[in-house]
Regions:
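Active-site rim helix/loop that mediates acceptor-substrate recognition in acyltransferases
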Residues: 44-63
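Acyl-donor (CoA/ACP) binding surface of acyl/acetyltransferases
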Residues: 1-38, 53, 66-181
Length: 181
């Protein structure tokens, strides 16, 4: 893990490395059928626990993984947003999963903007993608706000290979050109 661990700050949010204390909120998100609709469905607590540990481990092994997203005003965990690249994944992704209570407030785009800046500047990525279900209109809107465009259908690794996705993407050059405007 980078030392010190990264912490990003936006106008309303703090993005930090996940920790054990995030588990109950993380499990609530994993148990919410509406939130998990495009992410493989509801997950039992044991699976959520393994995923949290894998995310924390990824920070130590790879130096990146999704951040925990905390509202500054309440100190409340509202989701996870950030860089990921699983084995067999179609590219270097900035992904987002927010608790339903946090939907519709611009938090996903705000956090993903900070995470994208970080991935391009600190990780040196040349491109980011977002793997989005064709009928996930809300995530498509977030991708558009970030400046990403739909590149076409994508192929996910097992166990997600049965779920069709569209790849949205943009290059580092496109990102920084838009940010400079």
């Amino acid at each position: 893990m980078p030392s010190p661990p990264p912490m990003l700050e936006t106008a309303r949010l703090i993005l930090r490395v996940p920790c054990r204390d995030d588990f109950e909120a993380w499990a609530a998100v994993g148990g919410d059928a509406e939130v998990m609709r495009y992410l493989g469905g509801v997950q039992p607590r044991f699976t959520v626990w393994k995923n949290l540990l894998a995310t924390i481990g990824s920070w130590h092994v790879l130096g990146f993984a999704p951040f925990s997203v905390i509202r500054k005003d309440e100190g409340q965990w509202i989701g996870r947003v950030g860089p990921l690249r699983h084995a067999g994944w179609p590219g270097t992704e900035i992904g987002w999963t927010l608790a339903r209570a946090a939907w519709g407030r611009g938090y996903a785009a705000e956090a993903a903007t900070a995470a994208t800046d970080w991935a391009f500047t600190k990780l040196g990525w040349d491109e980011i993608i977002h793997c989005i279900a064709a009928d996930n209109i809300a995530s498509q809107q977030v991708a558009r706000k970030l400046g990403s465009v739909k590149r076409g259908p994508g192929k996910m690794p097992a166990p997600y290979d049965e779920e069709p996705v569209e790849i949205w993407a943009q290059s580092r050059e496109e990102w920084f050109a838009r940010r400079a405007q």
